[in-house]
Structure formats: C-alpha cells, structure tokens
C-alpha cells in the first residue's frame, strides 16, 4: 500500500488549497457570465425560444 514518506508542509498545503479555490472561483465567474449573456439575449452559443405575450384573436 502506498504511504507518503513525509508530512506535507503547511505552505505547500496552503498553495494547493488556494489553487483549488481559484479554480472554483473562475468556474463560478464563467457560469455567471454565461447566465447573464443568456438572460440579456447576447449569447451566441445558446438559442432560447422566445414566447410572445400576445393573445390570439
């Protein structure tokens, strides 16, 4: 069974944790930006069907 030989230093642990947090932050920013562009109708990659509010006569 594989066992680490030495304890990971606190600074290395902090660097890895911050990198992991940064990846999550950028994923959230990208998702929010995409949602904003879809809601404003400026998205070029999604086609949203627009429903009209006119009543049929």
UniProtKB/Swiss-Prot annotation:
GO terms for cellular component: chloroplast; large ribosomal subunit. Pfam families: Ribosomal_L32p. It is found in: Plastid, Chloroplast. One of its GO terms (biological process) is translation. InterPro entries: Ribosomal_bL32, Ribosomal_bL32_plant/cyanobact, Ribosomal_zn-bd. GO terms for molecular function: structural constituent of ribosome. Its main location: plastid. Keywords: Chloroplast, Plastid, Ribonucleoprotein, Ribosomal protein. Belongs to the bacterial ribosomal protein bL32 family. This is Large ribosomal subunit protein bL32c. It comes from Acorus calamus.
